[in-house]
């Protein structure tokens, strides 16, 4: 990776002011945990709101769509704020939106309107867009360029920790375990049905209210903390940054495409985990939520393991190997029965854990003064998480089998194989030419 003036400034700052940077870096790392936490409540919300509002798989997938459309809509504004006002401003805006959106779950639950929940999720996701657009590149530049991918994987490991904690400990608070059939609901009189739906919807209020207050408290702490905002270019370099300039990079173009399909795959696999566990393995939703916690734990362990393995195997090769393994695991999940399906999904989580940060780091490699623009464009590609889960839901509704829908993440991993192979081939050719 070519050193830029940005990286030289960062290295100097790290060596000269590491004590001053220690607390701010802890705060930034905590952001990875918090957005991972709220993202991994979505697979709990999907079966919960599907039950509360009697939704089809396609309708319940709109939860993911409302979240990831926000990434597409807000990535460019987030990038503009960072370029004009710096990383800290982007982080603060993100935290305020995140906190307010979480608190809005209280009136959404009181209203018993599905669209209000989607609106609150959209606001949360707008905040997450600012956070991810700022924090991901921030971590890659705070240290040697040669270890940027490993460093981002390590920070994202705390995202994986949240992927275990959220479903394992908050999931049982939200999921009541009451699974009434449509016939049982039809047999209720109006007051009984209203009270049942109100009880189901109300279980989300306290977790999201507490989360929102914590996020706003973090925003206050960061506001009063001196956050290093190392400039990645001089004024002339900043004026030269452009979308067309950034998109001239084949690495960035490939990263955008790969990230679109990766996020689509991750959301598909995770969001329908409970539906898969309850149908293929016949377990109750409360038990499925516990296994979703193991899914998150595997994701976290995969991040830590991947960070370690990258000391010995280059990132492109490891990404290629993991994508190939996940293709085989998707075949197993589609055709398997019983607990083998659940174990297959958990294994997919382990092997897809390194993909987001690895693709992200590869995509913005060598962008120089276009790094912030490139970061925004890759974050925009997260819209794959909005567009691909409804395809899975539609296949499930049409065929009557949720397992058939997992052809969608399988094809996503095929795209990632092509991306990783192309990047590895390019790296080998570059090394041969040196």
Give the positions of each predicted feature:
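Extracytoplasmic
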Residues: 23-53, 135-136, 170, 269-277
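Central cavity-lining transmembrane alpha-helices of secondary-active solute carriers
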Residues: 62-80, 293-305
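Helix-to-loop junctions at the C-terminal end of transmembrane segments
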Residues: 74-87, 174, 302-314, 396-397
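C-terminal ends and interior cores of transmembrane alpha-helices
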Residues: 96-111, 324-337
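Hydrophobic core of transmembrane alpha-helices in multi-pass small-molecule transporters
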Residues: 113-131, 340-355
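Intracellular juxtamembrane helix-capping segments at the cytosolic ends
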Residues: 130-144, 353-368
